[in-house]
Design a protein with these regions (language model features):
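A cross-family phosphate/adenosyl-ligand binding-site feature
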Residues: 2-137, 141-181
Length: 181
């Protein structure tokens, strides 16, 4: 364990073995509630250990956008790692995880991931996730998008990541349709 990580109670997998680990990154894009809500849902999954990394920009954005404090959000995770600590456990391929979700994913973080520019722990953990062939999901909230953004998304998708814009489901009989009219 690195000095920058906070150790919480480690859940055990349902079968008693090592818990399943998922890395959650919250970057500085608007939409920090997506990462917060993800952590709230994951907290109730038996045998799941969440490793949270919050960027410096995200710490500012989430205070502007939500009623949560950084401490509130950190309390939702099993472990918290400092984004400046590129030597933390999620930076290593030997740290087995089920994958990583970056929600929201800023264009800066998207670009770092698409170009293997691992200057932060979020970028390094995402790079390791891709290199190890594990699932990486990026929730890119930016809009509108210019061609440079789209090229970065394409590059990341070609590497195996899932680019998941947070678009509400408006299919047949959606409960959201009446709210929009």
């Amino acid at each position: 364990m690195t000095p920058s990580s906070r150790r919480g109670a480690s859940p055990r997998a349902v079968d008693g073995r090592t818990p399943t680990r998922l890395v959650v990154g919250i970057s500085g894009a608007s939409g920090s509630i997506y990462g917060i809500r993800l952590l709230e849902v994951l907290r109730d999954v038996p045998g799941l250990e969440t490793h949270l990394i919050i960027s410096r920009a995200a710490k500012r954005t989430l205070v502007d956008e939500t009623e949560y404090t950084v401490r509130d959000i950190e309390a939702l995770a099993t472990r918290v790692h400092d984004d400046r600590d590129i030597g933390a456990a999620p930076a290593s391929g030997s740290f087995r995880t089920a994958g990583m979700v970056v929600a929201p994913c800023s264009i800066k973080t998207l670009s770092a991931l698409a170009n293997s520019y691992a200057d932060t722990l979020i970028a390094r953990a995402g790079d390791v996730t891709l290199k190890e062939g594990r699932p990486l999901v990026v929730v890119v909230r930016e809009t509108p998008l210019h061609v440079g953004h789209l090229r970065q998304m394409l590059a990341l998708a070609e590497m195996g990541a899932v680019v998941l814009p947070p678009v509400p489901a408006l299919g047949r009989r959606s409960t959201l349709l009446p709210m929009l009219s």
